[in-house]
């Protein structure tokens, strides 16, 4: 009999340097996700990609130090907003975009 193993990767996560919108520190976010049994975590700051370099460097360092397993996934994404009218932004929708690979990351 085969079993389906479901893993959970949270996709709406922001960190401290993202417009002062969060108190999450990148290494702590990754370590906490691992301790909670998650298979990975995505960094999706609000309309900002500047945290991705620090994010990927932290992932590499934590794996080298064997603090997280090699198969732990640190995905890169972006939370974007869509509006109906650029001149009158009364209401907007949030969308999370996650890069599947390096081509997707360049597209973000």
Region locations from a protein language model:
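Phosphodiester-processing cores and adjacent nucleic acid-binding clamps
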Residues: 1-108
């Amino acid at each position: 009999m085969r079993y389906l193993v479901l893993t959970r990767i949270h996709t709406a996560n922001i960190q401290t340097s993202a417009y002062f919108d969060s108190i999450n520190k990148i290494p702590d976010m990754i370590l906490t996700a691992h301790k909670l049994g998650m298979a990975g975590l995505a960094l999706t700051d609000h309309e900002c990609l500047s945290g991705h370099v620090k994010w990927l460097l932290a992932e590499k360092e934590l794996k080298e130090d064997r603090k997280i397993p090699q198969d732990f996934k640190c995905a890169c994404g972006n939370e974007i907003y869509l509006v109906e009218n650029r001149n009158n932004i009364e209401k907007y929708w949030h969308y999370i975009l996650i890069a599947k690979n390096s081509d997707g990351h360049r597209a973000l």
